[in-house]
């Protein structure tokens, strides 16, 4: 029986990946379709991906698959063919190719079975996730942006919206997708007669959100095909104006793809124009925040003087201090409340 999980340390795997001479391509894809046995599907895909030297993050559930991966360039076409042949539901699936990319986005393959490929909190048995809004292609997106009857809804997190979004897009102020869904319905109820255009990074969240809006009585609902990634790619290929402003946050080592030259965010420590996310260098904090080069030098990559001081302690003392602290998901919590609390930022929603 082959080993179907990684047994090598992250540091060693990262060093191996960085030492590779072959270029890589970052690809994301998703598909809502019925998977009868997610665990068996996961194991088969793990072996296939491993044989091709693929790294990345893949989630499977009975409702489908969601993946962000790094593929050796020489194996991209083989990967495409094998994926399309793996299940009829995946044949011809759109693959989103990263815009700004050296392929060094992942260095380990993590493949997990979950209850949902996107945590939505929906437990309404009458909800039909397949009854989605109509797709919009790049030219249609630009036309909708000029339509006074259309409202663009950003279905991403606050830290994604902060560094980039479509012109005049509405942010849904919530910390998770599951919190955004009911809030979007509530916020847009008075605009039920408008054209609702939903978008996210690669399409997976806005597709489900569009179905949820239709389930709640909204009839004029669209979503951007392939999300921001596909929109920007197609707009550039077709010589269209790219109407997304700033940077597209991505969930890998890059933390962002530059879409336009505008920088619309600010360093969370000094307020200078900056849209570069980082994680606090103190392993006991790991806060996701925006930090300019000057503050990165001043605070040694940390979010605060306290974390900077803790990082300077001997490793044993750092581990002792971390013992008993909040662990797991709490340490990696990206909520607006935790960010504001750690950095003393006024909450814009209050």
Swiss-Prot record:
The active site is at 200 (cysteine persulfide intermediate). It is an enzyme of class 1 (oxidoreductase). Residues 146-240 form the Rhodanese domain. Residues 318-350 are annotated as: Disordered. GO terms for biological process: tRNA modification. Keywords: Oxidoreductase, tRNA processing. It catalyses: uridine(34) in tRNA + AH2 + O2 = 5-hydroxyuridine(34) in tRNA + A + H2O. GO terms for molecular function: oxidoreductase activity, acting on paired donors, with incorporation or reduction of molecular oxygen. Its EC number is 1.14.-.-. Gene3D superfamilies: 3.30.70.100, Rhodanese-like domain. Pfam families: Rhodanese, Rhodanese_C, UPF0176_N. Catalyzes oxygen-dependent 5-hydroxyuridine (ho5U) modification at position 34 in tRNAs. Belongs to the TrhO family. This is tRNA uridine(34) hydroxylase. The gene is trhO.
